[in-house]
Amino acid sequence: MAAYVVFMRDETLNPVELEKYSADVDVSFEGHDVTFLADYGTIETLEGHAIEGAVILQFPDMAAARAWYRSPEYQEAAEHRFRGARYRGFIVEGL
């Protein structure tokens, strides 16, 4: 069953760190079966507070999503994201 990783950027803290994250994150997808469904496109807030951006990634299942997120390559890149902005992120299982 497909699983989706969703990241919502609430607030940018350090644009330089986000640039480093963007430069480093692509290598983390190598060897993982991932499909980008949304990548910082236009957002219309329907409920709650507005966000700056969102990413939605599709993986074959929860285990594959976790394997990518926990990979050393992603965790190394994510350090820049953690310093660069406030995000919320989660994995949700599809139907």
Label for each model-derived stretch:
Residues M1-G53, P60-R66, R70, E93-L95:
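Short S/T/G/P-rich N-terminal loop/turn motif that feeds into the first structured element of a domain
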